[in-house]
Amino acid sequence: MAKYKITKTDEYYTYELPAHNECKLTRLHDPADVEGGKLILSRSHFLPAGGGTDFSTNAAESIYYVAKGKLLFKGEDGQETLLEEGDSVHIAANSPKCVTNVGVETAIMLVILL
């Protein structure tokens, strides 16, 4: 395996997931490039006024990082937390959660699956 691999923006690919509304998802690297294929880095663009996800789970641990905008994070316990630019949240595997864009601009979130 190479010691490093550069991925240019024209090499990214977009995809859709059923639980995501008004959301553009972009995979930022090929998971096969990571030893063991266990790390996935994606970027989510949530449109203003309600773009987001339904409650969903991931089989892997996740880290969400808000790169731009304001997102309302809700965990399975119903607690809501406003996430703003620079905030992050660690999510245990198989934990239900959802996020909603509550700002007036497109929100951008980096998603790291471990």
Set out the residue ranges of the language-model regions.
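A generic structural motif
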Residues: 61, 68, 78, 94-96, ...
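Short acidic-glycine-tyrosine-enriched beta hairpin
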Residues: 77-93
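Short, conserved beta-strand element in jelly-roll/cupin
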Residues: 45-47, 57-73
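Conserved short histidine dyad/triad with adjacent acidic residue
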Residues: 27-30, 40-58, 80, 93-96
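Surface loops and adjacent helix of pleckstrin homology
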Residues: 76-78, 102, 112
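A short, N-terminal "cap"/entry segment at the start of jelly-roll beta-barrel domains
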Residues: 1-38
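Short beta-strand His + acidic residue motifs that chelate non-heme Fe in jelly-roll/DSBH
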Residues: 53-55, 73-74, 91, 96-104
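A short hydrophobic beta-strand segment most commonly corresponding to one strand
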Residues: 44, 63, 90, 104-114
